[in-house]
Structures are given as C-alpha cells and as structure tokens.
Amino acid sequence: MMIPPAEMDGAGRGLRVNREPNQQDAALYQRCFSQFQSGVAAEARAWFFEHFDATTYANMQSRYPPGSRERHLLAEFLGFYESNGVLVSRGLLHEDVFFDAPFALDLVWGRVGPIIEEWQEATGEPGIWENVAWLGKRYKVWYETHWRPKVEAIPPEEGPI
C-alpha cells in the first residue's frame, strides 16, 4: 500500500500528512516505542533526563566532549529523534501518532533546541541534527493547531476513529 505524501508548501516542505493514521503507523510506532524502551536507547534516555544539564553549545562541548561516554549517550538519545524526524517529515509515520506518544519531545526540545541551533552555527553544518530540529519545531506547530485532550479528540463514547 502506498502512503500518500505530505502536503507541500511552495518550497517543497511537507506540511501535513494528507491521510488518517493507519495500521502501518501503528506497527511503526510499536517498533519506535520498543527501541525507545530498550538497550542503549533506554540508558541514554535515563542519562539525559537525570544528568544532562548543558544550556549552551559551549557548555555542552566542555561538559560532554567528543569521545566521552556522555557525548555518546547524547548522540544515542538524539539519534532516536533524528531518525523519527526523518519518518515524520516524509509522511512515513503520521505525526499525530508520533506527537501523541510518550516520547517527551516537548521536554527534550526545550532543553536541546537552543543547543542544536548553536551547534549548527558553530560548526557551519546546518544538517547536524536537522531532523531533531524539524521535529521540535513541527511539534510546536502541531500542538498549537491540532492537539486536543484525548477525551475531546476521541470521545470515549464514540470509540476509535
């Protein structure tokens, strides 16, 4: 089954997937969630929420230098959002499914958004964590324009869509 592409703006950027979430989204979500909960990804997530406290790129560089265990955990953690940003931005995973999931993107983006922007500027590499940045910015738009409390979005008396 071919998944319809996201609607595009004038610059060819995806705006919104032009379809309802489906079983493929559910299966992909389950794989993402499983990855998020296991192995190094789980260790990296725990480290991030318990220990990551950099507030600027320079601070991150000094506290978690390249080659350190902490930098590895940060890369593992951000890698989850980077790979899912690819899927969501290309319409391969419906944004409603990803953004409604318990991945704490709002908390993550609040902590790493400014650092990623500084990182891109400092290195002259706008592609560094670009999908994390896209996902964080898109989440904000999605939350402001599409999110509703679950009981309003899918009333219990009506059941699933």
Question: Where do the language-model regions lie?
Answer:
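Acidic, Ser/Pro/Thr-rich low-complexity regulatory regions
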Residues: 2-161
